[in-house]
């Protein structure tokens, strides 16, 4: 059964809003970037829901810190670590922004979204963290202008969005939140890998990456690699990460200087 036809989910393409019945704590908004919420063609009820979830600061406060699984150290518990970082940043909402960059099949896209939501719930359940679904904000940018877009195009849009999003969503600055540092890019090869195998991969794009000079005093200090989207540097500003647990595991592994530690140049898939 497709994501769109599933009786447990409601997907309204006209309003570009998804309300999940499978995951009642989820509220997902899919926004056409050229159209503000105030002008979206939708019913008053759906518009009200969209406006509500465009401001995650209205989400419930994160619960007080407490180990969910007594037999496991909070340091090794994914949910405990996400909760800890939310407290540190003074935030309520978490979750990577997703960019849809392939439009060959809506059915395939719907299945991808179904899988990423199911996988996120399953990952959190394993660490006793289903309560964090209350604070999960999944923002998807989908517009035909992103069809076939490079990581550089996605990064440019993401940086402009992130510049003001934290204040609008959280009512405070971005802190060290991964939500405003990284985003997920779904290209056709990403989609194919996920639908062909649950061990597929997605692209994770670093928002603040800048091209750097590989030369020092006239000598190249790193190997010149095969060009990826025109870049021959070792660090191209994006990497491929496992689909399994993608909303949860990179969230805490990339905290601080995690990118420098975990980065692998594509096509190698990073292993968290």
Model-derived features: where do they sit?
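Fungal secretory targeting signals
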Residues: 2-4
């Amino acid at each position: 059964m497709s994501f769109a036809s599933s009786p447990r989910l409601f997907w309204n393409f006209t309003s570009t809003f998804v309300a999940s019945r499978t995951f009642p704590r989820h509220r997902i908004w899919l926004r056409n970037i050229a159209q503000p919420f105030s002008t979206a063609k939708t019913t008053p009820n759906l518009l009200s829901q969209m406006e509500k979830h465009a401001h995650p600061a209205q989400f419930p406060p994160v619960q007080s810190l407490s180990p969910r699984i007594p037999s496991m150290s909070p340091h090794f518990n994914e949910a405990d670590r996400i909760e800890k970082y939310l407290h540190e940043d003074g935030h309520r909402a978490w979750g990577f922004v997703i960019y849809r960059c392939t439009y060959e099949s809506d059915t395939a896209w719907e299945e991808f979204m179904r899988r990423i939501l199911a996988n996120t719930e399953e990952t959190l359940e394993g660490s006793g963290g289903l309560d964090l679904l209350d604070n999960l904000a999944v923002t998807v940018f989908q517009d035909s202008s992103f069809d076939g877009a490079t990581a550089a195009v996605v990064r440019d849009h993401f940086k402009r969005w992130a510049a003001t999003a934290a204040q609008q969503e959280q009512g405070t600055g971005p802190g060290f939140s991964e939500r405003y540092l990284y985003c997920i890019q779904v290209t056709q090869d990403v989609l194919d890998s996920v639908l062909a195998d649950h061990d597929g991969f997605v692209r994770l794009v670093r928002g603040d990456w800048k091209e750097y000079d590989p030369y020092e005093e006239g000598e190249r200090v790193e190997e010149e690699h095969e060009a990826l989207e025109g870049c021959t540097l070792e660090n191209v500003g994006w990497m491929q990460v496992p689909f399994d647990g993608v909303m949860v595991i990179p969230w805490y592994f990339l905290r601080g200087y995690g990118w420098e530690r975990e980065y692998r140049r594509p096509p190698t898939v990073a292993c968290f």
